[in-house]
């Protein structure tokens, strides 16, 4: 039996996140040398990373970091395989560390984020791979948003009380208004609009909706002369449902979101909604 103590096992677990039996086995093989045991477990963990590549990661957390002056903010999704891992402190600490890194560095895109150094000599990709190895599940970082051109606010929604936030919304206004920012972000979390405004809907999507409206109207046997008016009405209904500014405001459904913003004298410049796994 190798010469090591319970304290060595505890230390190794804290350093690697590996299970107790794996730590004991590694210490046995390393003859009680903690550093060699750490190296052995990390090598074993990296082999496990490769094995987990084909597995699905549909659980996880959305994390936000907002500057004290609301001049900037970020939203980051980190995914894992099970809600058990998502609830854990180590997973949530990893997600928070990545979000703080994004807030400090403002990477241009995901590729730049993964290649950036979150710690001296360690890229974000290596950090994620290390979490993968330590937690024993596939860990995926593939979405984030970073705003820094207005008044930025976030709303985080928990779908289950014992889980970290599963839905996150980041909004950017042209001027400070905490009440409107919060209300609109809550609306976005609940109603999941696909686009900000009518002008943001891609032309091919509009044409597809128009064709569906025309075919549906004809199938209903409506007069051909009435077709254009009916189709436009249905297309406007699509815009009302699919665009944030066209939707009835969640906190006052007698007004559209656009009307609420106009009355407050603010412009919503952009938004991002992230729901874990979707």
Curated annotation (Swiss-Prot):
Recorded coiled-coil stretches: none
Name by which UniProt lists this protein: Elongation factor Ts
InterPro entries noted in UniProt: EF-Ts_dimer_sf, Transl_elong_EFTs/EF1B, Transl_elong_EFTs/EF1B_dimer, Transl_elong_Ts_CS, UBA-like_sf
GO CC term (a single one): cytoplasm
Primary gene name: tsf
Keywords: Cytoplasm, Elongation factor, Protein biosynthesis
Function: Associates with the EF-Tu.GDP complex and induces the exchange of GDP to GTP. It remains bound to the aminoacyl-tRNA.EF-Tu.GTP complex up to the GTP hydrolysis stage on the ribosome.
The family this protein is said to belong to: Belongs to the EF-Ts family.
GO molecular function: translation elongation factor activity
Principal location listed in the UniProt entry: cytoplasm
Location(s), subcellular: Cytoplasm
Organism, as annotated: Streptomyces avermitilis (strain ATCC 31267 / DSM 46492 / JCM 5070 / NBRC 14893 / NCIMB 12804 / NRRL 8165 / MA-4680)
Region annotation Involved in Mg(2+) ion dislocation from EF-Tu: where it falls in the sequence: 82-85
NCBIfam families, sorted: tsf
Keyword Protein biosynthesis attributed: yes
